[in-house]
């Protein structure tokens, strides 16, 4: 299961229900995908198919929505 947190432009932001416990978010785009760590600081974990410009755009969107992503994570993974 991979609940969508939100969509913005051509990006979809989501996480997988049965994955590691360190807070992170996955990003999909028609051109590729990326994963960003949210703790201890926002950082790119992996990417495939996205241009540097698309990665930066996704990272900026994640930064703007950090509180929303954090809330979704803590709601989905209580405790």
Regions found by a protein language model. Give the residues of each.
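Negatively charged, low-complexity tracts enriched in Asp/Glu with abundant Ser/Thr
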Residues: 1-11
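Generic preference for hydrophobic/aromatic residues in regular secondary structure cores
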Residues: 5, 43-47, 65
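Alpha-helical structural elements
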Residues: 6-8, 24, 68, 72
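A short, structured beta-strand/loop element
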Residues: 14-50
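C-terminal structural segments of small proteins and small subunits
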Residues: 49-79
